[in-house]
């Protein structure tokens, strides 16, 4: 066989494999996804950059495509928390917890992560509002559902934001210890630090 023909054939086959693989990845990434996932991811990116209004519109769009989309519901709750609309955030989180409790399948680790993150975030809201005993109960509930999901963030988060972030377990323990002290000796709120509490999203 002619070496030039063999080389041309090999190059064409290589290109065909690359195009087919790329097309498959593109299809899987954009077209073969559950309804609402794309808009939820866009909302999450905007939420992380502090663009709360646009983030909320993407989360709402995701919920139009897929009512009860757990990522979009959590995203809405986080927007409410970041904009200090705590009552609305509690309603969103209570709905999410109730819906997941009724519909979560046992073999869904991401769903368990969301079910743990919801009471952890509710605990943050209650903590900021001074309802420390209720906050502690929500932190404990989050730890019971899935401690790994609400534990210390990853390496990149530590480098970019905080090398020693507080965890749900740390905060629950701290509240418990403070509530054992006489009321005039308790230190349960430091507004500047409380405002920096890390929201949980699996």
Q: What is the predicted function of each stretch?
A:
Residues 31-65:
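Alpha-helical segment of the N-proximal tetratricopeptide repeat
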Residues 72, 106, 118, 151-152, ...:
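TPR alpha-solenoid repeat register
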Residues 26-30, 98-113, 148-159:
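Flexible helix-coil transition and linker loops at the boundaries of alpha-helical arrays
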Residues 3-7, 13, 17, 143-202:
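Terminal, low-structured helical/coil segments at or just beyond the last alpha-helical repeat
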